[in-house]
UniProtKB/Swiss-Prot annotation:
Cell wall formation. Its EC number is 6.3.2.8. This is UDP-N-acetylmuramate--L-alanine ligase. InterPro entries: Mur-like_cat_sf (IPR036565), Mur_ligase_C (IPR004101), Mur_ligase_C_dom_sf (IPR036615), Mur_ligase_cen (IPR013221), Mur_ligase_N (IPR000713), MurCDEF_pg_biosynth (IPR050061), UDP-N-AcMur_Ala_ligase_MurC (IPR005758). Belongs to the MurCDEF family. ATP binds at residues 129-135. It is found in: Cytoplasm. It is an enzyme of class 6 (ligase). Pathway: Cell wall biogenesis; peptidoglycan biosynthesis.
Amino acid sequence: MTASSVHSPVRQNRTGLGMRRIRHIHFVGIGGAGMCGIAEVLANQGYIVSGSDLRESAVTRHLRDCDIRVYIGHVDEHAHGADVLVVSTAVDLENPEIRWAREHRIPVVRRAEMLAELMRFRHGIAVAGTHGKTTTTSLTSTLLAEGGLDPTFVIGGKLTSAGTNARLGEGDYLVAEADESDASFLHLQPMVSIVTNIDADHMATYAGDFARLKDTFLEFLHNLPFYGLAVLCLDDDNVRGLLPRVQRQFVTYGFAEDADYRLRDFVQRGGEVQFTAERPPGMAPLEIRLGMPGRHNALNALAAIAVASDAGVDDAAIQQGLLHFAGVGRRFQVHGHYPAPGGEGDVMLVDDYGHHPREVEMVIDAVRAGWPERRLVMLYQPHRYSRTRDLYEDFVRVLSGVDTLLLLDVYSAGESSIPGAEGRTLAGSIRQRGQVDPIFVESKQELPALLSRVLRPDDILITQGAGDIGGISLRLAAGQLDLNGMEL
Protein backbone atom coordinates (compact mmCIF):
# COMPACT_ATOMS: atom_id res chain seq x y z
CA MET A 1 0.00 0.00 0.00
CA THR A 2 1.66 3.20 -1.11
CA ALA A 3 1.08 6.91 -0.75
CA SER A 4 0.28 7.08 -4.47
CA SER A 5 -2.98 5.25 -3.75
CA VAL A 6 -4.33 7.92 -1.41
CA HIS A 7 -6.59 9.78 -3.84
CA SER A 8 -8.52 6.96 -5.49
CA PRO A 9 -10.27 7.83 -8.74
CA VAL A 10 -14.06 7.79 -8.79
CA ARG A 11 -15.19 4.18 -9.11
CA GLN A 12 -18.40 2.40 -9.92
CA ASN A 13 -21.00 2.83 -7.20
CA ARG A 14 -21.18 -0.37 -5.13
CA THR A 15 -23.89 0.60 -2.66
CA GLY A 16 -26.56 -1.03 -4.81
CA LEU A 17 -30.01 0.03 -5.97
CA GLY A 18 -31.09 0.85 -2.44
CA MET A 19 -29.27 4.19 -2.53
CA ARG A 20 -30.33 5.16 -6.06
CA ARG A 21 -32.29 8.14 -4.66
CA ILE A 22 -29.20 9.48 -2.89
CA ARG A 23 -26.79 11.80 -4.70
CA HIS A 24 -25.67 14.32 -2.08
CA ILE A 25 -24.52 13.12 1.36
CA HIS A 26 -23.77 15.67 4.10
CA PHE A 27 -21.72 14.81 7.21
CA VAL A 28 -22.25 16.74 10.45
CA GLY A 29 -18.98 16.45 12.38
CA ILE A 30 -17.04 15.40 9.29
CA GLY A 31 -13.65 15.94 10.96
CA GLY A 32 -14.17 13.09 13.42
CA ALA A 33 -12.00 9.99 13.19
CA GLY A 34 -14.97 7.76 12.41
CA MET A 35 -16.60 10.13 9.93
CA CYS A 36 -13.90 11.40 7.59
CA GLY A 37 -12.97 7.99 6.20
CA ILE A 38 -16.54 7.12 5.26
CA ALA A 39 -16.92 10.53 3.61
CA GLU A 40 -13.76 9.98 1.56
CA VAL A 41 -14.83 6.53 0.35
CA LEU A 42 -18.27 7.81 -0.66
CA ALA A 43 -16.73 10.73 -2.55
CA ASN A 44 -14.52 8.28 -4.42
CA GLN A 45 -17.63 6.29 -5.33
CA GLY A 46 -19.02 9.32 -7.12
CA TYR A 47 -21.40 10.81 -4.56
CA ILE A 48 -21.52 14.54 -3.89
CA VAL A 49 -20.16 14.79 -0.35
CA SER A 50 -20.11 17.81 1.93
CA GLY A 51 -19.69 18.28 5.64
CA SER A 52 -19.28 20.62 8.57
CA ASP A 53 -17.15 20.67 11.68
CA LEU A 54 -16.52 23.02 14.57
CA ARG A 55 -12.90 23.76 13.73
CA GLU A 56 -10.34 23.63 10.98
CA SER A 57 -7.87 20.73 11.18
CA ALA A 58 -5.49 18.64 9.13
CA VAL A 59 -8.43 16.30 8.50
CA THR A 60 -10.69 19.00 7.07
CA ARG A 61 -7.87 20.22 4.84
CA HIS A 62 -7.28 16.67 3.58
CA LEU A 63 -10.98 16.25 2.81
CA ARG A 64 -10.96 19.43 0.73
CA ASP A 65 -8.06 17.95 -1.22
CA CYS A 66 -10.44 15.06 -1.98
CA ASP A 67 -12.93 17.54 -3.54
CA ILE A 68 -15.23 17.43 -0.52
CA ARG A 69 -16.81 20.74 0.47
CA VAL A 70 -16.14 21.33 4.16
CA TYR A 71 -17.71 24.13 6.20
CA ILE A 72 -16.44 25.36 9.55
CA GLY A 73 -19.27 25.94 12.00
CA HIS A 74 -22.84 24.70 11.95
CA VAL A 75 -25.68 26.57 10.23
CA ASP A 76 -28.64 25.08 8.42
CA GLU A 77 -27.57 26.40 5.01
CA HIS A 78 -24.64 23.98 5.03
CA ALA A 79 -27.04 21.06 4.67
CA HIS A 80 -29.14 22.53 1.88
CA GLY A 81 -29.38 20.22 -1.11
CA ALA A 82 -28.43 17.08 0.82
CA ASP A 83 -30.43 13.88 0.36
CA VAL A 84 -29.24 12.41 3.68
CA LEU A 85 -27.33 13.61 6.74
CA VAL A 86 -24.76 11.43 8.49
CA VAL A 87 -24.11 12.40 12.11
CA SER A 88 -21.65 11.33 14.77
CA THR A 89 -22.71 10.66 18.35
CA ALA A 90 -20.66 13.69 19.44
CA VAL A 91 -23.09 16.03 17.63
CA ASP A 92 -25.98 17.59 19.56
CA LEU A 93 -29.30 16.57 18.03
CA GLU A 94 -30.36 20.23 18.31
CA ASN A 95 -27.67 21.10 15.78
CA PRO A 96 -29.23 23.53 13.24
CA GLU A 97 -28.28 21.33 10.28
CA ILE A 98 -30.02 18.34 11.86
CA ARG A 99 -33.09 20.45 12.71
CA TRP A 100 -33.28 21.64 9.10
CA ALA A 101 -33.05 18.08 7.79
CA ARG A 102 -35.89 16.88 10.00
CA GLU A 103 -38.06 19.83 9.04
CA HIS A 104 -37.55 18.95 5.37
CA ARG A 105 -38.00 15.16 5.70
CA ILE A 106 -34.33 14.48 5.00
CA PRO A 107 -33.15 11.22 6.64
CA VAL A 108 -30.64 11.60 9.48
CA VAL A 109 -28.52 8.47 10.05
CA ARG A 110 -25.66 7.56 12.33
CA ARG A 111 -22.22 6.94 10.89
CA ALA A 112 -22.48 3.19 11.55
CA GLU A 113 -25.62 2.98 9.40
CA MET A 114 -23.74 4.49 6.47
CA LEU A 115 -20.76 2.22 7.11
CA ALA A 116 -23.15 -0.75 7.10
CA GLU A 117 -24.41 0.36 3.69
CA LEU A 118 -20.85 0.44 2.36
CA MET A 119 -20.29 -3.03 3.80
CA ARG A 120 -23.52 -4.53 2.49
CA PHE A 121 -22.22 -5.32 -1.00
CA ARG A 122 -18.70 -6.30 0.03
CA HIS A 123 -17.00 -9.01 2.06
CA GLY A 124 -17.03 -7.03 5.29
CA ILE A 125 -14.44 -7.49 8.04
CA ALA A 126 -15.37 -5.63 11.23
CA VAL A 127 -12.81 -5.13 13.99
CA ALA A 128 -14.29 -4.65 17.46
CA GLY A 129 -12.84 -4.43 20.95
CA THR A 130 -12.19 -1.85 23.63
CA HIS A 131 -8.51 -1.57 22.70
CA GLY A 132 -6.51 -2.21 19.54
CA LYS A 133 -9.21 -1.66 16.91
CA THR A 134 -7.31 0.89 14.85
CA THR A 135 -4.03 -1.03 14.79
CA THR A 136 -5.72 -4.37 14.06
CA THR A 137 -7.82 -2.85 11.27
CA SER A 138 -4.66 -1.31 9.78
CA LEU A 139 -2.71 -4.56 9.99
CA THR A 140 -5.55 -6.56 8.45
CA SER A 141 -5.94 -4.07 5.59
CA THR A 142 -2.20 -4.15 4.97
CA LEU A 143 -2.03 -7.95 4.77
CA LEU A 144 -4.99 -8.17 2.39
CA ALA A 145 -3.40 -5.49 0.21
CA GLU A 146 -0.04 -7.30 0.29
CA GLY A 147 -1.89 -10.42 -0.86
CA GLY A 148 -3.26 -8.62 -3.90
CA LEU A 149 -6.86 -8.39 -2.66
CA ASP A 150 -6.98 -4.54 -2.87
CA PRO A 151 -9.38 -3.94 0.04
CA THR A 152 -11.40 -0.87 0.84
CA PHE A 153 -10.61 0.27 4.37
CA VAL A 154 -12.04 2.75 6.87
CA ILE A 155 -9.78 3.25 9.89
CA GLY A 156 -9.91 5.52 12.96
CA GLY A 157 -6.28 6.60 12.51
CA LYS A 158 -3.98 7.43 9.62
CA LEU A 159 -2.35 4.37 8.05
CA THR A 160 1.19 5.63 7.57
CA SER A 161 1.93 3.70 4.38
CA ALA A 162 -1.19 5.07 2.66
CA GLY A 163 -1.09 8.56 4.17
CA THR A 164 -4.81 8.41 4.92
CA ASN A 165 -7.37 6.62 7.08
CA ALA A 166 -9.57 5.47 4.20
CA ARG A 167 -9.19 4.10 0.71
CA LEU A 168 -11.57 2.75 -1.90
CA GLY A 169 -10.15 -0.49 -3.28
CA GLU A 170 -11.09 -2.49 -6.36
CA GLY A 171 -11.43 -5.76 -4.45
CA ASP A 172 -14.36 -7.36 -2.67
CA TYR A 173 -13.09 -6.80 0.88
CA LEU A 174 -13.96 -3.90 3.17
CA VAL A 175 -12.14 -3.66 6.51
CA ALA A 176 -13.48 -1.27 9.13
CA GLU A 177 -13.52 -0.54 12.83
CA ALA A 178 -16.68 -1.48 14.70
CA ASP A 179 -17.42 1.11 17.38
CA GLU A 180 -18.90 -0.14 20.65
CA SER A 181 -18.85 3.29 22.33
CA ASP A 182 -22.49 3.97 21.39
CA ALA A 183 -23.43 0.36 20.51
CA SER A 184 -23.73 1.45 16.88
CA PHE A 185 -21.63 -1.52 15.75
CA LEU A 186 -24.86 -3.49 15.95
CA HIS A 187 -25.81 -1.90 12.60
CA LEU A 188 -22.98 -3.79 10.90
CA GLN A 189 -23.47 -7.18 9.23
CA PRO A 190 -19.97 -8.30 8.27
CA MET A 191 -18.73 -11.67 7.04
CA VAL A 192 -15.83 -11.72 9.53
CA SER A 193 -15.75 -10.14 12.99
CA ILE A 194 -12.68 -9.70 15.19
CA VAL A 195 -12.99 -9.04 18.93
CA THR A 196 -9.66 -8.03 20.46
CA ASN A 197 -10.82 -7.60 24.07
CA ILE A 198 -13.71 -6.33 26.19
CA ASP A 199 -13.03 -3.79 28.93
CA ALA A 200 -14.98 -1.26 30.98
CA ASP A 201 -15.27 1.92 28.91
CA HIS A 202 -18.14 4.07 27.61
CA MET A 203 -20.19 2.56 30.40
CA ALA A 204 -22.87 5.27 30.25
CA THR A 205 -24.03 3.65 26.99
CA TYR A 206 -24.64 0.42 28.91
CA ALA A 207 -26.17 2.00 32.04
CA GLY A 208 -23.03 1.10 33.99
CA ASP A 209 -23.76 -2.62 33.51
CA PHE A 210 -20.68 -4.58 32.40
CA ALA A 211 -22.77 -7.72 31.76
CA ARG A 212 -24.86 -5.68 29.35
CA LEU A 213 -21.70 -4.56 27.55
CA LYS A 214 -20.60 -8.18 27.12
CA ASP A 215 -24.06 -9.18 25.91
CA THR A 216 -23.87 -6.43 23.30
CA PHE A 217 -20.58 -7.81 22.00
CA LEU A 218 -22.26 -11.22 21.75
CA GLU A 219 -25.13 -9.67 19.79
CA PHE A 220 -22.55 -8.08 17.48
CA LEU A 221 -21.04 -11.52 16.82
CA HIS A 222 -24.45 -12.98 16.10
CA ASN A 223 -24.93 -10.38 13.35
CA LEU A 224 -22.57 -12.59 11.37
CA PRO A 225 -24.32 -14.86 8.85
CA PHE A 226 -24.35 -18.56 9.71
CA TYR A 227 -21.44 -19.00 7.28
CA GLY A 228 -19.43 -16.12 8.77
CA LEU A 229 -16.37 -16.29 11.01
CA ALA A 230 -15.52 -14.74 14.38
CA VAL A 231 -11.86 -14.23 15.32
CA LEU A 232 -11.62 -13.99 19.11
CA CYS A 233 -8.74 -13.22 21.48
CA LEU A 234 -8.44 -16.05 23.97
CA ASP A 235 -6.05 -14.11 26.22
CA ASP A 236 -8.84 -11.75 27.24
CA ASP A 237 -10.87 -13.27 30.08
CA ASN A 238 -14.04 -11.45 29.08
CA VAL A 239 -13.82 -12.67 25.49
CA ARG A 240 -13.00 -16.20 26.65
CA GLY A 241 -16.06 -16.09 28.88
CA LEU A 242 -18.29 -15.47 25.86
CA LEU A 243 -17.15 -18.54 23.92
CA PRO A 244 -19.73 -21.02 25.29
CA ARG A 245 -22.48 -18.63 24.15
CA VAL A 246 -21.17 -17.87 20.65
CA GLN A 247 -23.41 -19.52 18.04
CA ARG A 248 -21.25 -18.81 15.02
CA GLN A 249 -18.11 -20.48 13.73
CA PHE A 250 -15.06 -19.00 15.43
CA VAL A 251 -11.31 -19.32 15.73
CA THR A 252 -9.28 -18.10 18.67
CA TYR A 253 -5.89 -16.44 18.93
CA GLY A 254 -3.46 -15.50 21.68
CA PHE A 255 -0.49 -16.53 23.77
CA ALA A 256 -2.76 -19.13 25.41
CA GLU A 257 -1.74 -22.73 24.69
CA ASP A 258 -5.29 -23.67 23.65
CA ALA A 259 -5.60 -20.90 21.04
CA ASP A 260 -6.13 -21.92 17.40
CA TYR A 261 -3.64 -19.26 16.32
CA ARG A 262 -0.97 -19.33 19.00
CA LEU A 263 1.79 -16.79 19.57
CA ARG A 264 5.01 -18.24 20.96
CA ASP A 265 8.74 -17.43 21.24
CA PHE A 266 7.96 -13.72 21.64
CA VAL A 267 11.00 -11.41 21.83
CA GLN A 268 11.12 -7.61 21.83
CA ARG A 269 14.26 -5.66 20.92
CA GLY A 270 13.76 -1.92 21.00
CA GLY A 271 10.76 -1.06 18.86
CA GLU A 272 10.61 -4.41 17.04
CA VAL A 273 9.07 -7.73 18.06
CA GLN A 274 9.67 -11.23 16.72
CA PHE A 275 7.50 -14.27 17.31
CA THR A 276 6.27 -17.53 15.83
CA ALA A 277 2.64 -17.70 14.75
CA GLU A 278 1.37 -21.26 15.07
CA ARG A 279 -1.74 -21.87 12.99
CA PRO A 280 -4.42 -24.59 12.80
CA PRO A 281 -3.54 -28.00 11.32
CA GLY A 282 -2.70 -27.87 7.64
CA MET A 283 -1.03 -24.45 7.82
CA ALA A 284 2.68 -24.03 8.51
CA PRO A 285 3.90 -21.85 11.40
CA LEU A 286 5.09 -18.38 10.40
CA GLU A 287 8.20 -16.60 11.67
CA ILE A 288 7.15 -12.98 12.10
CA ARG A 289 8.98 -9.68 12.50
CA LEU A 290 6.93 -6.57 13.27
CA GLY A 291 8.23 -3.03 13.68
CA MET A 292 5.92 -2.17 16.57
CA PRO A 293 6.69 -2.75 20.25
CA GLY A 294 4.66 -4.62 22.83
CA ARG A 295 2.89 -7.91 23.39
CA HIS A 296 -0.40 -6.18 22.59
CA ASN A 297 0.76 -5.30 19.09
CA ALA A 298 1.94 -8.87 18.53
CA LEU A 299 -1.60 -9.98 19.42
CA ASN A 300 -3.07 -7.42 17.02
CA ALA A 301 -0.82 -8.81 14.30
CA LEU A 302 -1.89 -12.37 15.12
CA ALA A 303 -5.55 -11.42 14.64
CA ALA A 304 -4.66 -10.00 11.22
CA ILE A 305 -2.74 -13.20 10.40
CA ALA A 306 -5.84 -15.26 11.21
CA VAL A 307 -8.01 -13.19 8.86
CA ALA A 308 -5.40 -13.14 6.08
CA SER A 309 -4.89 -16.90 6.38
CA ASP A 310 -8.65 -17.46 6.13
CA ALA A 311 -8.71 -15.23 3.02
CA GLY A 312 -5.99 -17.31 1.37
CA VAL A 313 -3.22 -14.71 1.48
CA ASP A 314 0.16 -16.27 0.68
CA ASP A 315 2.46 -16.92 3.67
CA ALA A 316 5.27 -14.82 2.19
CA ALA A 317 2.86 -11.91 1.67
CA ILE A 318 1.81 -12.11 5.34
CA GLN A 319 5.43 -12.05 6.49
CA GLN A 320 6.40 -9.22 4.14
CA GLY A 321 3.33 -7.17 5.01
CA LEU A 322 4.15 -7.30 8.71
CA LEU A 323 7.87 -6.78 8.20
CA HIS A 324 7.28 -3.55 6.28
CA PHE A 325 4.24 -2.33 8.23
CA ALA A 326 4.89 1.36 8.86
CA GLY A 327 2.45 1.85 11.71
CA VAL A 328 -0.55 4.05 12.41
CA GLY A 329 -0.71 7.70 13.36
CA ARG A 330 -0.64 8.31 17.12
CA ARG A 331 -0.21 4.60 17.97
CA PHE A 332 3.25 4.51 19.57
CA GLN A 333 4.35 6.83 16.78
CA VAL A 334 8.04 7.69 17.04
CA HIS A 335 8.43 11.23 15.74
CA GLY A 336 12.20 11.36 16.12
CA HIS A 337 14.67 12.75 18.63
CA TYR A 338 15.29 16.09 20.32
CA PRO A 339 18.62 17.29 21.75
CA ALA A 340 18.53 16.79 25.51
CA PRO A 341 18.42 20.11 27.37
CA GLY A 342 21.74 21.01 28.94
CA GLY A 343 23.65 17.89 28.02
CA GLU A 344 24.89 15.50 25.40
CA GLY A 345 22.59 12.92 23.90
CA ASP A 346 18.98 13.24 22.92
CA VAL A 347 15.41 12.45 23.91
CA MET A 348 13.30 9.94 21.97
CA LEU A 349 9.90 11.45 21.10
CA VAL A 350 6.85 9.16 21.04
CA ASP A 351 3.17 10.01 20.65
CA ASP A 352 0.33 7.67 21.60
CA TYR A 353 -3.44 7.98 21.52
CA GLY A 354 -4.19 5.57 24.38
CA HIS A 355 -6.43 7.11 27.04
CA HIS A 356 -7.75 4.11 29.00
CA PRO A 357 -5.65 2.78 31.92
CA ARG A 358 -5.13 -0.56 30.18
CA GLU A 359 -3.89 1.17 27.02
CA VAL A 360 -1.51 3.40 28.97
CA GLU A 361 -0.23 0.37 30.87
CA MET A 362 0.48 -1.46 27.60
CA VAL A 363 2.53 1.50 26.38
CA ILE A 364 4.52 1.59 29.62
CA ASP A 365 5.12 -2.17 29.45
CA ALA A 366 6.31 -1.86 25.84
CA VAL A 367 8.83 0.84 26.79
CA ARG A 368 10.13 -1.15 29.77
CA ALA A 369 10.57 -4.24 27.58
CA GLY A 370 12.25 -2.48 24.69
CA TRP A 371 14.34 0.15 26.45
CA PRO A 372 14.77 -1.08 30.04
CA GLU A 373 17.74 1.19 30.74
CA ARG A 374 16.02 4.45 29.76
CA ARG A 375 13.88 6.79 31.86
CA LEU A 376 10.25 7.11 30.87
CA VAL A 377 8.85 10.65 31.02
CA MET A 378 5.13 10.83 30.29
CA LEU A 379 3.08 13.90 29.49
CA TYR A 380 -0.47 12.67 30.06
CA GLN A 381 -3.74 14.40 29.26
CA PRO A 382 -6.80 12.64 30.75
CA HIS A 383 -9.70 12.31 28.31
CA ARG A 384 -13.25 12.95 29.59
CA TYR A 385 -14.22 13.61 33.19
CA SER A 386 -16.55 10.59 33.21
CA ARG A 387 -13.77 8.19 32.20
CA THR A 388 -11.42 9.73 34.79
CA ARG A 389 -14.09 9.29 37.48
CA ASP A 390 -15.09 5.76 36.50
CA LEU A 391 -11.51 4.44 36.22
CA TYR A 392 -9.90 6.73 38.79
CA GLU A 393 -8.05 4.16 40.90
CA ASP A 394 -6.79 2.38 37.79
CA PHE A 395 -5.38 5.66 36.49
CA VAL A 396 -3.66 6.30 39.83
CA ARG A 397 -2.05 2.85 39.77
CA VAL A 398 -0.98 2.88 36.11
CA LEU A 399 0.35 6.43 35.96
CA SER A 400 2.41 5.73 39.08
CA GLY A 401 4.49 3.36 36.95
CA VAL A 402 6.42 6.01 35.00
CA ASP A 403 9.64 7.69 36.11
CA THR A 404 8.48 11.28 35.66
CA LEU A 405 4.87 12.36 35.12
CA LEU A 406 3.60 15.68 33.83
CA LEU A 407 -0.18 15.74 34.12
CA LEU A 408 -2.43 18.12 32.22
CA ASP A 409 -6.00 18.88 33.16
CA VAL A 410 -8.78 16.78 31.68
CA TYR A 411 -9.64 17.19 28.00
CA SER A 412 -13.40 17.47 28.42
CA ALA A 413 -14.54 16.35 24.93
CA GLY A 414 -17.67 18.42 25.57
CA GLU A 415 -18.40 17.11 29.07
CA SER A 416 -19.00 19.30 32.10
CA SER A 417 -16.47 19.14 34.92
CA ILE A 418 -17.09 16.46 37.55
CA PRO A 419 -15.88 17.24 41.10
CA GLY A 420 -13.10 14.88 42.14
CA ALA A 421 -12.24 13.92 38.56
CA GLU A 422 -10.08 16.93 37.68
CA GLY A 423 -6.43 16.65 36.68
CA ARG A 424 -5.23 18.39 39.84
CA THR A 425 -7.12 15.94 42.05
CA LEU A 426 -5.71 13.00 40.11
CA ALA A 427 -2.20 14.40 40.52
CA GLY A 428 -2.75 14.60 44.28
CA SER A 429 -3.89 10.99 44.50
CA ILE A 430 -0.88 9.80 42.49
CA ARG A 431 1.43 11.78 44.77
CA GLN A 432 -0.21 10.25 47.83
CA ARG A 433 0.46 6.75 46.47
CA GLY A 434 4.14 7.57 46.81
CA GLN A 435 5.75 6.05 43.71
CA VAL A 436 6.11 9.18 41.61
CA ASP A 437 5.72 12.90 42.34
CA PRO A 438 3.64 14.23 39.43
CA ILE A 439 3.90 17.76 38.11
CA PHE A 440 0.47 19.23 37.46
CA VAL A 441 0.60 21.45 34.38
CA GLU A 442 -1.69 24.46 34.78
CA SER A 443 -1.33 25.57 31.17
CA LYS A 444 0.32 24.27 28.02
CA GLN A 445 2.32 27.50 27.95
CA GLU A 446 4.29 26.12 30.90
CA LEU A 447 5.36 22.99 29.03
CA PRO A 448 8.58 24.23 27.37
CA ALA A 449 10.05 25.35 30.69
CA LEU A 450 8.84 22.24 32.53
CA LEU A 451 10.16 19.84 29.90
CA SER A 452 13.47 21.68 29.83
CA ARG A 453 13.71 21.15 33.59
CA VAL A 454 12.85 17.44 33.74
CA LEU A 455 14.29 15.93 30.56
CA ARG A 456 17.70 14.26 30.56
CA PRO A 457 19.85 12.62 27.88
CA ASP A 458 18.48 9.23 26.70
CA ASP A 459 15.01 9.83 28.15
CA ILE A 460 11.92 8.65 26.30
CA LEU A 461 9.21 11.34 26.25
CA ILE A 462 5.71 10.04 25.53
CA THR A 463 2.84 12.42 24.87
CA GLN A 464 -0.15 10.29 25.85
CA GLY A 465 -3.86 10.84 25.40
CA ALA A 466 -6.72 11.34 22.94
CA GLY A 467 -7.06 15.09 23.38
CA ASP A 468 -5.13 17.92 21.75
CA ILE A 469 -1.57 17.15 22.88
CA GLY A 470 -0.67 14.99 19.88
CA GLY A 471 1.27 17.70 18.09
CA ILE A 472 3.79 18.44 20.83
CA SER A 473 6.31 15.69 20.11
CA LEU A 474 5.94 16.27 16.37
CA ARG A 475 6.70 19.98 16.81
CA LEU A 476 9.73 19.17 18.95
CA ALA A 477 11.04 16.73 16.36
CA ALA A 478 10.48 19.25 13.57
CA GLY A 479 12.31 22.01 15.44
CA GLN A 480 9.15 24.11 15.75
CA LEU A 481 9.18 24.26 19.54
CA ASP A 482 12.07 25.46 21.67
CA LEU A 483 12.25 24.13 25.22
CA ASN A 484 13.52 27.50 26.33
CA GLY A 485 9.98 28.66 25.71
CA MET A 486 10.36 30.38 22.35
CA GLU A 487 8.58 29.43 19.16
CA LEU A 488 11.11 28.89 16.39
